[in-house]
């Protein structure tokens, strides 16, 4: 089974992202920063106090179209205004999506907010403190004759940086509660995503207490599209390192400002 995690950057590099999706071979594809604008396709522009970025209007639909033999699961963390190319405003949902190959029976789904609660930003997106969710899916791997629980996370963004804060500690505790509630005894468990944390965060101690081992550590998980010197963001943890056949932090192709994390079990 191949599990891939990627912060998709709202599809800002869709011309590169689309062929990568076609060829990545993921049985479970966990994406963060997924957009959904009802009734609209093509491109939009996202703006907050810090950034102005191109985004796909409906990255969720774009990926579903390219993965017709996967179940596409989506949970929205918040919503706010974006503009199309004619500068007309639309309401865009923003969140997480997990795509599961149709030959893997989905036997459990659960989502929870790890920070805040769903919010409609009426006039402008805030540049920090936005709600964050996690999405768990439990599947049966027939070939390996085991159950696998995969938890997809997009962690809290704080304009002050990625150091631990009380909000991030509370996020870790909520995440741990979700993991414990979603998996069952004996499940191989994978927790992955853009954590927005430093490698020495106490979050990893909280997850280690659940028997989860981080495979990323202090490695660089950003691409050349990210200009800042601090290169830590994405992580992937497993409950049984012995079940890992291969793990890669993919340096090419570049399809986002984050590198994809590729796990073969």
Regions found by a protein language model. Name each.
Residues 3-7, 20-51, 99, 137, ...:
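Active-site beta-strand/loop signature of hydrolases that rely on acidic residues for catalysis
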Residues 5-10, 126, 164-169, 193:
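Short, flexible loop segments at the rims of nucleotide/cofactor-binding pockets, characterized by
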Residues 10, 35-147, 249-252:
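Structured beta-strand-rich core segments of catalytic domains in phosphoester-bond hydrolases
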Residues 11-21:
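Short, acidic/polar
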Residues 11-13, 36-39, 80-82, 157-161, ...:
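Active-site environment of divalent metal-dependent phosphoester hydrolases
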Residues 52-57, 166-174:
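Charged helix-capping and loop-helix junction motifs
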Residues 104, 177-190, 195-265:
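Metal-dependent phosphoester-hydrolase catalytic domains
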Residues 121-122, 131, 142-169:
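Metal-dependent phosphoester/phosphodiester hydrolase catalytic core
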């Amino acid at each position: 089974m191949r599990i891939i995690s990627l912060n998709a950057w709202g599809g800002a590099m869709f011309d590169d992202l689309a062929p990568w999706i076609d060829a990545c071979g993921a049985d479970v594809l966990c994406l963060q920063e997924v957009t959904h604008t009802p009734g609209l396709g093509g491109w939009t522009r996202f703006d907050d106090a810090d950034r102005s970025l191109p985004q796909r209007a409906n990255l969720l639909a774009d990926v579903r179209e390219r993965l017709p033999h996967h179940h596409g699961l989506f949970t929205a963390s918040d919503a706010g205004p974006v503009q199309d190319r004619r500068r007309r405003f639309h309401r865009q949902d923003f969140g997480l999506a997990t795509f599961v190959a149709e030959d893997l029976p989905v036997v459990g789904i659960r989502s929870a907010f790890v920070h805040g609660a769903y919010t409609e930003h009426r006039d402008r997106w805030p540049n920090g403190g936005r709600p964050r969710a996690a999405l768990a899916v439990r599947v049966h791997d027939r070939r390996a004759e085991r159950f696998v629980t995969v938890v997809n996370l997009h962690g809290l963004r704080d304009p002050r940086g990625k150091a631990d804060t009380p909000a991030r500690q509370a996020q870790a505790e909520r995440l741990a509660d979700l993991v414990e509630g979603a998996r069952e005894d004996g499940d191989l468990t994978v927790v992955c995503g853009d954590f927005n944390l430093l490698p020495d965060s106490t979050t990893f101690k909280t997850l280690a207490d659940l028997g989860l081992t981080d495979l990323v550590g202090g490695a660089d998980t950003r691409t050349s599209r990210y200009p800042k010197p601090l290169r830590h963001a994405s992580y992937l943890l497993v409950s049984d390192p012995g079940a890992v056949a291969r793990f890669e932090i993919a340096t090419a192709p570049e399809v986002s400002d984050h590198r994809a994390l590729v796990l073969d079990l």
